[in-house]
Amino acid sequence: MTKPYGSSLDDHLDAEVAREPSLADTAATIRALAAAAIDVSETVGRGSLAGDLAAQGEHNSDGDVQKALDVIAHKRFMQALEEAPVAQVASEEAEDVVTLKAGAPLAVAIDPLDGSSNIGVGMVVGTIFGIRPVTPGEDPNASFLTPGTTQTAAGFVVYGPATTFVVTLGNGTRIFTLDRTDNVFRLTHDAMKIVPSASEYAINASNVRHWDGPVKSYIEDCLRGSEGPRDRDFNMRWTAALVADAQRVLIRGGVFLYPGDNRKGYAQGRLRLLYETAPIAFLIEQAGGGATDGQGRILERVATKIHERSPLVFGSTEEVECVAKYYDGRQPSAGRSPLFGQRGLMRS
């Protein structure tokens, strides 16, 4: 159902619960996350006036050096979730699952601060989350070792020129923008539909020498533009913040790629399945797009550990399908072009 622009996130959640009463706990959890996001947005917006938010501290669960803002965001979201109907939280900033309310119905996977490398230079950062039902039993990890299709909701926050809250409860994807006059998230993009094709891709091209054949071939053909097999010119974008690239794809289409590569520890890429790729995949699919790991649908993947990684390709359906053709052999393999050959501008 189309909703009036400018209506609040609270109004939207009320309508979703009226449509599906079983979503009441999910809606309450989203309200808590949105309140925390407003607080984090205020801190991000102050920049260096809030202190050295890029100051390095300890290492997180994945071995990355934590920045001061990573710790601030993690703490604020955990405080918010303590007041929500949440039993367990899997956070990028915690090695193990954190148990909150025993007997509560939901489990939340969250990256409190996506795009940490952007903190010190005033660029976009964000938050990503996915909400799932609790799996009964004594193992706190069990709730997260299920397919992404079990998510009841997913969302991300973009802390940029505007603060946006992008969310789905399985009934379409919507963008709410923070109105700073009253600190309320208001609807600005309703029931989004990703265009099926667009001439824009996002990838970190500095890793070209590490990519496998299908990715090299796909990007090579995009670079050839109107003179190559794609018959049109492409633009490349890369922000080093998954949330920013995801929001751009939602609004104007295109494709995002973070593939696995041949660097040590990167066979499954760098993004984490539970609190990065699965939530983004849910949002993208709910907007009519596609999301794959190159071999299959992201939402059908089942994590075997909390911080498991996953390759990710998402965006306009025709482009995602095009990438899939390179992976399954329906397009020629890499190594046929001087662009990525031994004598080319970009050596493999």
Swiss-Prot record:
Binding site for substrate: 114-117, 204
Keyword Electron transport found: no
Pathway: Carbohydrate biosynthesis; gluconeogenesis
Cofactor note text: Binds 2 magnesium ions per subunit.
InterPro entries attached to this UniProt entry: FBPase_C_dom, FBPase_class-1, FBPase_N, FBPtase, Fructose_bisphosphatase_AS
Alphabetized UniProt keyword annotations: Carbohydrate metabolism, Cytoplasm, Hydrolase, Magnesium, Metal-binding
Cofactor(s) needed by this chain: Mg(2+)
Keyword Metal-binding (UniProt): yes
Predominant cellular place of this UniProt entry's protein: cytoplasm
A Pfam family hit: FBPase
GO cellular component: cytosol
HAMAP family the UniProt entry points to: FBPase_class1
Family classification: Belongs to the FBPase class 1 family.
Full protein name: Fructose-1,6-bisphosphatase class 1
Species of origin: Methylorubrum extorquens (strain CM4 / NCIMB 13688)
Name of the gene this protein is made from: fbp
